[in-house]
């Protein structure tokens, strides 16, 4: 019974966000994604209570579609501190976007997007992360993660 309740709570974590469709396999099929879910004491030092990520490889247009979903969510949910960065190191390219996307009860919610590719290929390795916790801001979260 407890597992069923935990599963229901996890399923609702991104409710109301466009990116929820990605996590539920409606944009990229589940079998093409590597998913990680963490809840509990292992996240306490980061002041987080829930972490969920998906990683997958897609073409440029699909990667751009997922980034737009993350950006749209950042606009529609009391977003603060959105940060975007595009980096080129020789033939390696990456796009990063991080934002706070409102609250779930008494927890702040955060979204991160990263796409990486080499050279002129249209294939992108994409990671999207959703996090919840008592951490107050994106800046504080970055500080906690960087001090590990």
Language-model segments: which ranges?
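Bacterial Sec-dependent N-terminal signal peptides
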Residues: 1-19
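Early exported N-terminus immediately downstream of N-terminal targeting peptides
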Residues: 15-64
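A structural motif
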Residues: 15-18, 29-32, 85-102, 107-109, ...
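Mature extracytoplasmic domains of secretory-pathway proteins
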Residues: 54-108
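Solvent-exposed coil/turn segments that connect beta secondary-structure elements
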Residues: 61, 115-118, 134
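Short, hydrophobic/aromatic-rich beta-strand segments within well-structured domains
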Residues: 98, 109-115, 127-129
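Short, low-complexity Ser/Thr-rich regulatory SLiMs
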Residues: 101-103, 114-119
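C-terminal partner/receptor-binding element of secreted or periplasmic proteins
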Residues: 121-148
């Amino acid at each position: 019974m407890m597992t069923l309740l935990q599963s229901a709570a996890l399923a609702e974590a991104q409710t109301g966000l466009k990116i929820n469709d990605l996590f539920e396999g409606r944009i990229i099929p589940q079998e093409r994604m590597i998913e990680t879910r963490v809840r509990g004491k292992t996240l306490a030092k980061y002041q987080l209570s829930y972490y969920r990520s998906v990683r997958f490889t897609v073409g440029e247009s699909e990667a751009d579609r997922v980034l737009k979903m993350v950006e749209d969510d950042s606009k529609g949910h009391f977003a603060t501190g959105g940060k975007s960065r595009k980096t080129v190191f020789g033939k390696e390219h990456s796009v990063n976007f991080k934002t706070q996307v409102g609250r779930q009860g008494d927890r702040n919610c955060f979204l991160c997007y990263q796409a990486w590719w080499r050279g002129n290929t249209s294939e992108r390795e994409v990671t999207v992360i959703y996090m919840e916790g008592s951490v107050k801001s994106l800046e504080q979260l970055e500080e906690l993660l960087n001090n590990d």
